[in-house]
């Protein structure tokens, strides 16, 4: 009886060992993994080799973590030679899908607001797509983390994030003893002039730096709009120390819109910022859209304009 019991136990142990081996083999042979970005989970290749990128803002982040791509979007901006050499698939909002499919990507990276329209076509071709809701500077660190995990370069991503956060802290430390400047951020386009809320790129950096955006006093605190109507009458009442102007569109159309809404009115000349020559036009490359890895440089530019303090990295 004792011998039978020992044999039974031995048999059970063998079965468990075989089962354990089978489970280990199954796990190690998995070809996909699940990654999360801002609460959204994506199934992607375990070790992607052909990453197609439809947005150059995502592309720069991918290469920052030592990732590689097989495509980019067309642009007039100057790119690093390695990025310039990649096949261009057309403008960000108008991708050539035939060309993309011919590249045979194993995963596609794009933006929800630009590339959602291509999602069903990618699905029908069994190509996983990661469409990011990548918008404000708050998304930069999560994006780097995600791309580090996607490419299996987690350590590189952590290093890039550490430098990025250290540089931002350096900018903040440079003005920690300054009286917060009162700022208005105007968005000037060919259609008119509005004011930025904290949801917009430049105003969010103003907030991060501890400056006061005078526009927020007119909001209920729940708005998700990036810009809101803002009259010269309200601007005159707020009378900020500095007016930052972020432009979008053709220069002559913007000038015309600014004259109509603001500068042709005699009240404009009475503004403190105008009288002190503190109306500052900011380059759209850094201040209209998320500047990504250049966020510390953009914030340093705001500090230079607001306080006259140089911050170098």
Where are these regions (language model features)?
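Short helix-initiation/N-cap motifs at beta->coil->alpha
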Residues: 36-38, 87-98, 220-231
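Alpha-helical, coiled-coil/dimerization segments enriched in small aliphatic residues
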Residues: 75-79, 194-226
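Proline-aspartate-enriched helix->loop->beta-strand connector
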Residues: 97-110, 127, 232-245
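Flexible loop/hinge segments that line or gate small-molecule binding clefts
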Residues: 79-82, 114, 118-150, 280
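Structured C-terminal subdomain patch of bacterial secreted/periplasmic proteins
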Residues: 141, 149, 242-313
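Bacterial Sec-exported substrate-binding components of ABC uptake systems
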Residues: 3-8, 19-57, 156-186, 247, ...
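A short, structured surface patch at a secondary-structure boundary
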Residues: 53-103, 107, 112, 214
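Extracytoplasmic ligand-binding site segments that recognize negatively charged/polar headgroups
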Residues: 133-146, 184-205, 251-253
């Amino acid at each position: 009886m004792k011998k039978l019991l020992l044999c039974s136990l031995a048999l059970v142990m063998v079965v468990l060992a075989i089962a354990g081996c089978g489970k280990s083999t199954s796990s190690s042979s998995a070809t996909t993994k699940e990654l999360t970005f801002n609460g959204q989970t994506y199934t992607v290749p375990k070790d992607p080799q052909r990453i197609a990128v439809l947005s150059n803002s995502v592309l720069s982040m991918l290469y920052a973590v030592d990732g590689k791509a097989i495509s980019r979007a067309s642009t007039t901006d100057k790119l690093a030679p390695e990025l310039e050499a990649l096949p261009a698939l057309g403008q960000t909002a108008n991708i050539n899908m035939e060309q993309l499919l011919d590249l045979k990507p194993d995963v596609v990276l794009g933006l929800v607001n630009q590339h959602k329209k291509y999602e069903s076509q990618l699905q029908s071709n069994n190509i996983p797509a990661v469409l990011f809701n990548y918008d404000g500077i708050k998304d930069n660190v999560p994006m780097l983390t995600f791309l580090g995990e996607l490419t299996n370069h987690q350590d590189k991503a952590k290093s890039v994030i550490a430098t990025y956060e250290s540089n931002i802290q350096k900018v903040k430390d440079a003005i920690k003893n300054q009286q917060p400047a009162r700022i208005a951020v105007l968005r000037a386009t060919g259609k008119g002039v509005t004011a930025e809320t904290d949801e917009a790129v430049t105003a969010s950096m103003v907030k991060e730096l501890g400056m006061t955006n005078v526009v927020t006093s007119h909001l209920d605190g729940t708005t998700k709009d990036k810009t809101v109507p803002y009259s010269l009458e309200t601007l005159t009442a707020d009378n900020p120390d500095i007016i930052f102007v972020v432009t979008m569109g053709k220069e002559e159309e913007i000038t015309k819109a600014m004259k109509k809404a603001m500068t042709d009115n005699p009240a404009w000349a009475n503004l403190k910022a105008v009288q002190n020559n503190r109306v500052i036009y900011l380059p759209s490359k850094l201040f209209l859209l998320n500047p990504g890895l250049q966020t510390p440089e953009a914030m340093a530019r705001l500090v230079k304009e607001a306080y006259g303090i140089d911050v170098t990295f």
